[in-house]
């Protein structure tokens, strides 16, 4: 018996030791892979930067430690990483050109315009750009059209079709469950509530949406026309004929592409451009490789570039559905901006905003911190795809506002939308409520028991009215405009940045680089460098987050899986997490 117990204990100790040793070896292997991934990248002569244009592009690249196991790097591309890599490729004499691998790129046009402009600047160095793809989405083609040569697979597709905007309406769907919506708002154009209360677009919403997509399409056609030498009328004709269903040969005749080739043939053509022998290899650098290519000397003063992207909420704990990267949490942002304000090494701040708005209270808090920051050092706002409603609220106090021509901004308005569940709970489910109270409004807002009464709705409307007046006043102060002038361009209306420039909601059309240059000018800096904030999460935090349901990696997987249903899914799922009063973009549309 003693021998049996000894053998069992020895076996258990041995197994325990084995797992410890294997755990240590595994951890060392992971650390080794991460360390090797972060090692400085050597650039060989006759190198080519291979830029993959597929998937989604976020504002900031997020580290995905799972990529070393999954091999999937396309989901974590950051605009900041892409722009930085293009700059490095331009400056490095050993990198001879950029090879664009086009594909199913799902990103809005202001972001694509940033990339396209950077590629156009790259070409000014005398280096070449070649694009190739089996399938070009319209956005991918818009970017790729700046290349010296655009090639396509002999059976490939260019999905050139124009821009359409669709809104989903849930009124009848929710009514089947006995759910209605209590809505109060200020602003004729503040139509975010329509998706819950109407069956189609209002005339005001249709007007502003049509204006937005028409302006964006004009900008796209003008850029492609200039690069490809195709008239705008022809581009519209091609869109009407829906090129995706036309024969590939049609694309060559239409001058949309320069030729039809297979992938290996394009690579041979690139070798000829580089004057390499057929047997010579091309040294290819991916986006991840480029991130580890040494930058130029870091000299001069620091300009901080702070990224704020996603729905506006008050607390990071509110951002529990997916990753915190999809939210602007006011408490964290205010703390970060205060730290930058008090950092004597930071001479100016560029706040990069990409948001359709959100919580009105949170927007007010960030407005205050932006105002305090401006008192100490220049603060320039760079607007991404969206900087509307609550996002414009927080932008208003900036020293200078820069937006891409295709940026959607404005939407100065407030609304509250609250689900009335009383029909579901009492009628459908048969639940009954009774109450006692000390004061008239002690049970205010219990919409599971009953709808708002007239007095309650009037009080909520008064609160929204006060929020709108304050929003309007903040814009007037920040933009140095009379309140009356702000009212004429407010009412919840969204504006394309080209129009926003004319009505003084923005100061300049351009991208992040233009915003940085303006910040340097305002701070009177000759030599400067930029640093990105917030700092990237540690690899351990990133790994744990990637494996959780709140990870950015899984969020992107869900985005690709759900496709067109991702946006309504996230909106409906987040309703119960919202504060009642919102300063949010006036509609949730799917733009294609």
PLM region descriptions:
Residues 2-50, 59, 96, 121-128, ...:
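Flexible, low-complexity junctional segments that flank or bridge functional domains
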Residues 47-167, 296-424:
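Cleft-lining beta-strand/loop regions that shape enzyme active-site pockets
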Residues 132-134, 184, 285, 382, ...:
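Conserved beta-strand termini and adjacent loop/short-helix elements that scaffold enzyme active sites
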Residues 167, 171-270, 379, 422-503, ...:
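Charged, glycine-interspersed solvent-exposed loop segments at helix/strand-loop junctions
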Residues 226-227, 258-302, 415, 472-478, ...:
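C-terminal long alpha-helix characteristic of the crotonase
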Residues 300-303, 307-343, 463, 534-592:
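Intrinsic disorder and flexible/low-complexity segments
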Residues 307-310, 353-355, 383-385, 405-407, ...:
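Active-site proximal loops enriched in glycine and acidic residues that flank catalytic Cys/His/Asp
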Residues 360-365, 499-502, 542-547:
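Short glycine/threonine-rich loop-to-helix capping motif typified by GTGT followed
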């Amino acid at each position: 018996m003693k021998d049996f117990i000894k053998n069992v204990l020895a076996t258990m100790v041995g197994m325990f030791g084995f797992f410890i040793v294997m755990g240590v070896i595994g951890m060392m292997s992971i650390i080794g892979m991460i360390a090797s991934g972060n090692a400085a990248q050597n650039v060989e002569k006759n190198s080519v930067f291979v830029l993959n244009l597929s998937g989604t592009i976020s504002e900031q690249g997020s580290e995905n430690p799972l990529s070393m196991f999954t091999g999937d790097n396309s989901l974590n591309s950051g605009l900041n990483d892409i722009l930085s890599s293009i700059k490095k490729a331009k400056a490095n004499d050993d990198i001879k050109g950029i090879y664009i691998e086009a594909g199913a790129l799902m990103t809005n046009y202001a972001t694509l315009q940033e990339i396209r402009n950077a590629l156009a600047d790259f070409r000014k160095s005398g280096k070449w750009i070649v694009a190739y793809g089996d399938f070009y989405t319209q956005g991918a083609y818009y970017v790729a059209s700046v290349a010296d040569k655009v090639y396509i697979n002999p059976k490939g597709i260019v999905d050139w079709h124009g821009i359409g905007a669709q809104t989903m309406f849930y009124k009848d769907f929710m009514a089947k469950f006995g759910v209605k919506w209590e809505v109060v708002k200020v602003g004729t154009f503040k139509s975010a509530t329509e998706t819950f209360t109407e069956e189609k677009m209002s005339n005001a919403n249709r007007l502003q949406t049509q204006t937005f997509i028409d302006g964006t399409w004009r900008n796209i056609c003008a850029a492609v026309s200039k690069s490809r030498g195709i008239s705008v009328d022809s581009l519209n004709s091609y869109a009407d004929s829906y090129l995706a269903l036309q024969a590939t040969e049609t694309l060559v005749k239409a001058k949309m592409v320069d030729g039809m080739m297979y992938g290996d043939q394009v690579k041979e053509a690139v070798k000829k451009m580089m004057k390499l022998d057929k047997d010579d290899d091309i040294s290819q650098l991916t986006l991840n490789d480029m991130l580890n290519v040494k930058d130029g000397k870091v000299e001069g003063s620091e300009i901080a570039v702070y990224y704020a992207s996603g729905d506006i909420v008050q607390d990071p704990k509110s951002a529990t559905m997916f990753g915190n990267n999809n939210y602007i949490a006011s408490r964290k942002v205010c703390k970060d901006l205060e730290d930058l304000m008090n950092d004597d090494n930071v001479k100016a701040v560029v706040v990069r905003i990409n948001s359709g708005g959100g919580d009105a209270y949170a927007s007010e808090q960030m407005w205050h911190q932006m105002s305090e920051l401006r008192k100490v050092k220049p603060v320039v706002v760079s607007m991404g795809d969206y900087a509307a409603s609550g996002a414009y609220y927080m932008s208003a106090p900036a020293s200078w506002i820069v937006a891409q021509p295709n940026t959607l901004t404005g939407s100065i308005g407030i609304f509250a939308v609250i689900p009335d569940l009383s029909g579901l709970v009492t009628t459908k489910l048969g639940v009954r409520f009774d109450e006692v109270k000390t004061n008239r409004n002690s049970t205010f807002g219990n919409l599971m028991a009953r709808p708002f009464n007239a007095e309650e709705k009037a009080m909520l409307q008064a609160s929204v009215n006060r929020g709108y007046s304050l929003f309007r006043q903040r814009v007037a102060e920040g933009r140095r405009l009379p309140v009356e002038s702000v009212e004429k361009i407010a009412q919840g209306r969204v504006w394309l940045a080209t129009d926003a420039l004319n009505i003084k909601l923005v100061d300049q059309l351009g991208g992040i680089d233009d915003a940085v240059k303006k910040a340097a000018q305002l701070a009177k800096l000759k030599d400067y460098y930029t640093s990105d904030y917030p700092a990237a999460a540690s690899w351990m935090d990133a790994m744990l987050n990637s494996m959780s349901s709140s990870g950015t990696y899984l969020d992107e997987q869900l985005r690709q899986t759900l496709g067109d249903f991702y946006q309504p899914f996230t909106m409906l799922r987040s309703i119960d997490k919202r504060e009642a009063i919102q300063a949010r973009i006036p509609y949730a549309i799917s733009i294609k």
